[in-house]
Swiss-Prot record:
GO terms for biological process: selenocysteine biosynthetic process; seryl-tRNA aminoacylation. It is an enzyme of class 6 (ligase). InterPro entries: aa-tRNA-synt_IIb, aa-tRNA-synth_II, aa-tRNA-synth_II/BPL/LPL, Ser-tRNA-ligase_type_1, Ser-tRNA-synth_1_N, SerRS_1_N_sf, SerRS_core, tRNA-bd_arm. One of its GO terms (cellular component) is cytoplasm. Belongs to the class-II aminoacyl-tRNA synthetase family. Type-1 seryl-tRNA synthetase subfamily. This is Serine--tRNA ligase. ATP binds at residues 257-259, 344-347. Consists of two distinct domains, a catalytic core and a N-terminal extension that is involved in tRNA binding. L-serine binds at residues 226-228, 280, 379. The gene is serS.
Length: 411
């Protein structure tokens, strides 16, 4: 959640940044009106409170005590009424603020959508083929690695069954990713895939994205869309010791997304599924640590792709493509020769103190004061898309898939 005090004190500047992130102008106008009303009602409340304080002290020496008591009683009722007005405005303001995204960093390019994201660099050269490379779903069906028909039969569309060497390769990737991330100093944690509403709120999924979540009927439980959600919230409501930071974690999980806005996109294959697997990086840092830890996380995910021999590029997301909780995001896109283009395989984001304010994660700084932490997250990597990338990049003209050397010991 945004710092409401900063929003109120620097409204025009913050509102301009939020417009770049596609926040509705009517919502910003409503916020401005609420801030003005709240200021007015707080002044009135302070006047009533000042009257109460002043004349309460004079009551003992007043000549007409009964008259003053009556005035103080009447004023106390006004204080209660005015406090209720202020509380109602603060609650309305906070409710609207819950659906307002994070402010983009100064380095984030202003743009409308993914077409205005900025390429930062390319890593490795895409492979060349003396034949027309196939897409992963063609390879997967011919090798009996991917069973879409039975996936749909037991579930619905956008579900797939992995079989034979395809399932083994997926498992090998998970183990390799966890080991690689641990070698870079990230502690492995294993968390529940079902979390409560407060946890979903803490990382920004609720209330704005409620319709995109899978919820258990009659229970306050949601299936996670990313392990960022439970891992970040491991420390919700806590005050951490300064010397314990940064906390750097990696986690494997299944992820569940309705993909409501993706009708007609990636309808073939396993690029976009309702259930998929991901190995995540999550870090909790002091303010001054978050930029360097962001670079560490980005380097970890990029080096992991390089270790698999997969050509990829770094993209800085523009304001219009930036996620709800993120202040800055760099996407990694892997080269898929079957599609003849780069596709997203990782997003590394710095959320600054936005999630920490919602989840109430703080640390005691060197001056002994409680300060909000910064939270960061990133995929290292999306398992299914890495499987896709290996299938397409390591295929031969006979339709066989060669396994990267670093994975062979995991079979």
């Amino acid at each position: 959640m945004l710092d409401l005090k900063n929003l109120q004190n620097n409204f025009d500047e913050v509102a301009k940044k939020l417009k770049n992130k596609k926040v509705d102008e009517n919502i910003l106008k409503k916020l401005a009106e609420l801030f003005a009303s709240l200021k007015k009602e707080k002044i009135a409340l302070e006047e009533f409170q000042a009257f109460q304080n002043k004349f309460s002290k004079e009551l003992a020496t007043a000549e007409d005590k009964e008259s003053l008591k009556a005035k103080l009683s009447e004023n106390k009722s006004k204080i209660n009424e005015q406090s209720a007005k202020v509380n109602a405005l603060e609650n309305e303001l906070e409710e609207i603020a819950h659906a307002i995204p994070n402010i983009p960093d100064e380095c984030v390019p202003v743009g409308e959508d993914e077409n205005e994201n900025v390429e930062l660099k390319k890593v490795l050269n895409p492979p060349s083929f003396d034949f027309t490379p196939k897409e992963h779903f063609e390879l997967g069906e011919s090798l009996n690695w991917l069973d879409f028909i039975r996936g749909v039969k037991i579930s619905q569309s956008r579900f797939c069954v992995l079989k034979n060497e395809g399932a083994l390769l997926s498992r090998a990737l998970v183990n390799y990713m966890i080991d690689f991330n641990r070698s870079r100093g990230f502690e492995f944690v294993n968390v529940p895939f079902l979390v409560n509403g407060a946890t979903m709120f803490g990382t920004g999924q609720l209330p704005k994205f409620k319709e995109d979540m899978y919820k258990v009927d009659d229970e306050d439980l949601y299936l996670i869309s990313t392990s960022e959600i439970p891992v970040t919230n491991l420390y919700s409501g806590e005050i951490l010791a300064s010397e314990t930071l940064p906390i750097k974690m990696t986690c494997y999980s299944a992820c569940f997304r309705k993909e409501a806005g993706s009708a007609g996109r990636d309808t073939r294959g396993i690029i976009r599924q309702h259930q998929f697997e991901k190995v995540e990086l999550v870090s909790i840092t002091k303010t001054e640590q978050s930029d360097s830890v962001f670079n560490e996380m980005l380097e970890c995910a990029s080096d992991l792709l390089s270790s698999l021999g997969l050509a990829h590029r770094h993209l800085m997301l523009c304001t219009g493509d930036l996620g709800f909780s993120a202040a800055k995001t760099v996407d990694l896109e892997v080269w898929l020769p079957g599609q003849n283009k780069y596709r997203e395989i990782s997003s590394v984001s710095n959320c600054r103190d936005f999630q920490a304010r919602r989840a109430k994660i703080r640390y005691k700084n060197e001056q002994g004061k409680n300060e909000l932490v910064h939270t960061l997250n990133g995929s290292s990597l999306a398992v299914g898309r890495t499987l896709v990338a290996i299938m397409e990049n390591y295929q031969d003209k006979e339709g066989k898939i060669h396994i990267p050397d670093v994975l062979k010991k995991y079979f």
